Design a protein with these regions (language model features):
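A detector for short, charged/polar N-terminal pre-domain segments
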Residues: 1-9
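Short amphipathic helical patch at the helix-1/turn junction of helix-turn-helix
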Residues: 8, 19-20, 48
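Short basic helix-loop element that most often maps to the first helix and adjoining turn
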Residues: 12-31, 56, 61
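Residues in the helix-turn-helix
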Residues: 27, 38, 48, 67
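Recognition helix of helix-turn-helix/homeodomain-like DNA-binding domains
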Residues: 32-47
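Short, basic-rich loop-to-helix N-cap that marks the start of a DNA-contacting helix
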Residues: 46-56
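Short C-terminal boundary/hinge segments that cap the last helix of small helical domains
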Residues: 49-51, 62-71
Length: 71
């Protein structure tokens, strides 16, 4: 699996979890100290997500990091 495919899978998983919780992109962005554009980029797999950001996303979505990257 390529890095691009992994980024897209990660983004899709984050988007699905966010939508399950009824969180708008803007609110998730505020929760992790980011902005809506960055959340859109993450969810569409166009940016790399570092460990610190991955941890903040997992905390905000109330899941374990492994739940985001289990692919």
């Amino acid at each position: 699996m390529s890095t691009d495919e992994r980024r897209k899978q990660l983004g899709a998983r984050i988007k699905a979890l966010r939508e399950q919780q009824g969180l708008p992109q803007r609110k998730l962005a505020l929760m992790i100290g980011s902005n809506q554009t960055h959340i859109w980029q993450i969810e569409n797999g166009t940016v790399n997500v570092g460990l610190d950001l991955l941890c903040r996303l997992a905390d905000a979505l109330e899941v374990n990091v492994r739940d985001l990257i289990d692919f």
